Amino acid sequence: METKNKNKLIIYTFFGFFLLVGFITYDDYGVSIEEHTQLYSGVYWLNYIVNFFEIDFLKERVLQNLNSFAYYSDLPDPRIYNYYGPIFDVPTALIDVIFNIQKTSLYFQYRHFIVFLFFYLSSIVFFHLLLKRFDNFLISFFGTAMYIFSPRIYGDSFHNNKDIILLSFVVFSIFFAFKIFEKIKIKKILLFSLFAAIATSTRVMGLFLPISLIIFLYLEKLNDKSTSNIKYILLAIFSYLLFLFLHWPYLWESPISSFIEFISKS
């Protein structure tokens, strides 16, 4: 019991200090050209959503933000590079509109902090994932420290709103995949499918998540001769595709052809 309390104190202190450092230093990082591209993409898709659902009270303000990018002629046109996932870019573009953010530096500073928060949450989940896998506090603690303080990952965790978001949702997905194999429940499959769908729209590599789960569920079915896994496989496929479609405007008009195009372009 004493060891358990000591371990809790260590991990709470560690994650508390990590959060404090992130809060103090998130605005110390520069801005890459890709961040401007994602900013443009977010406003473009927000404008699409606002018009698709006829949200009249936002139309003018969103269009004003979109038109401001006419000055950035060197940025990739989101009408052509229209397959970037929306999970980070669209909500932050909506924040810009709602709070009428005009200061350019603030655009990126709060985005850096949100990217860090995603990574911070993923590091907590990663610790619990290792704890489930190894059932050893020291291995889990040092494994998490390596995950966090890998120089490239740590630096990117404040500004890379594609790869860090992907990494975070991969961790979330794998955590729930482990939970599924502990004891299959519909809620776990739905959460896995949601996170895997977001990972896929962020980067095409996220496709390996549902494919891997389906393969392992099928292998488990062969091992125990049970037919129950078939319904869970079908649920995983259906819910994954549904979440992919629902959260990704790129797929709304022609889901199949757009998804094939996404794979071919990536």
What are these regions (language model features)?
Residues 125, 129, 165-182, 191-196:
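Specific aromatic-rich, kink-prone transmembrane helix
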Residues 48-51, 81-90, 100-103, 198-200, ...:
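Transmembrane-lumen/periplasm boundary regions of multi-pass, lipid-linked membrane glycan transferases
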Residues 12, 124-149, 182, 186-187, ...:
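Transmembrane-helix signature of polytopic, membrane-embedded enzymes
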Residues 109, 113-134, 172, 176:
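Transmembrane-helix motifs of polytopic, lipid-linked glycan transferases
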Residues 140-148, 175, 196, 200:
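Short helix- or helix-capping micro-motifs
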Residues 7-35, 43-73, 146, 199, ...:
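Transmembrane signal-anchor helices characteristic of membrane glycosylation enzymes that use polyprenol
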Residues 32, 158-165:
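Short acidic/glycine- and proline-prone juxtamembrane loop motifs at membrane-interface regions
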Residues 190-192, 205-220:
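Transmembrane-embedded, aromatic-rich helix segments that form part
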